[in-house]
Amino acid sequence: MEIDLKDKIMKLKKEKNAVILAHFYQPKDVQEVADYIGDSYFLIDVGEKCKEDTIVFCGVKFMAESAKILSPNKKVIFPTPKAICPMANMITKEDVLKLKEKHPNAKVVCYINSTAEVKSVVDVCCTSSNAIEIVNNLESNEIIFLPDKNLGSYIQENTPNKKIILWDGYCYVHNKIKASDIIKAKEEYGNDINVLVHPECRKEVRELADYIGSTKGIINFAQNSNSKKYLIVTECGVIHELKKKNPDKEFYMLDMHCSNMKMNSIKEIYTCLKNYNNEVKIDENIKRKAVRALEKMHSL
């Protein structure tokens, strides 16, 4: 049944001139039918540059929205509309406006993991891989960073000349990991294990890392390192790409499972491609304002 569905998806892709984009955290079978696998920034960039008319975005809602904002003339379909990012929903447009009123001299930087409405009222977006560079390149010394307090504190550590005002948002998958989890894992797997940590983790976890970086950064580090054993401290879906690129290395994961990222399935991909349903729609006014923040990220 699964093989049959995969064949049908491949056929439909050609018929409908569609490209399938899947985030590293997606289920293995979804990654297997994708044309491109990557982090949110890479996938949104691919969607903007690809020749296909239709983008099937397998991730969570903010990613599909961002793809639509930067590719307004393409049809963006989202297999499972209920797959939202809880962190993105921890702040509203109204919250941002109140922060701006309270800190009128501050520039507002939002993590790409935020809604289209929030993106429409900030100065610039960033990703976990370019956040430090973006903040350093802003002229203002006062920066409101939202919604992720953990990534925000990591930025503050690496931009000491800036004052970072944080929002109390977090990724529930990364935020639950504590230093004791890392210590326990090292006791189990050996102190020689390389600990690779996503910056959405708490400071106490980052302090025990051998490397801190985005999902793509973690994959690149493992690929280029001579070490053979790694503890991967991010969502478990990234293991598929790590094993594919490094078959001779050992990877160990913590219990880090994003149920929202796992909502997409090849059945939903097939259904939305077949029926052209679940198209991403964004208010034109919001889209016009949000695109400025995303485009400024490219310029910085």
UniProtKB/Swiss-Prot annotation:
Keyword match Mitochondrion: no
Top-rank taxon: Bacteria
Cofactor note (record): Binds 1 [4Fe-4S] cluster per subunit.
Transmembrane segments: none
GO MF annotation list: 4 iron, 4 sulfur cluster binding; metal ion binding; quinolinate synthetase A activity
Protein's pathway: Cofactor biosynthesis; NAD(+) biosynthesis; quinolinate from iminoaspartate: step 1/1
GO biological process, one term: 'de novo' NAD biosynthetic process from L-aspartate
Main localisation: cytoplasm
Enzyme class: transferase
Keyword hit for Ribonucleoprotein: no
Record-listed E.C. numbers: 2.5.1.72
Signal peptide limits: none
A Pfam family the protein falls into: NadA
Homology family: Belongs to the quinolinate synthase family. Type 2 subfamily.
Protein name as annotated: Quinolinate synthase
Species of provenance: Clostridium novyi (strain NT)
UniProt gene name: nadA
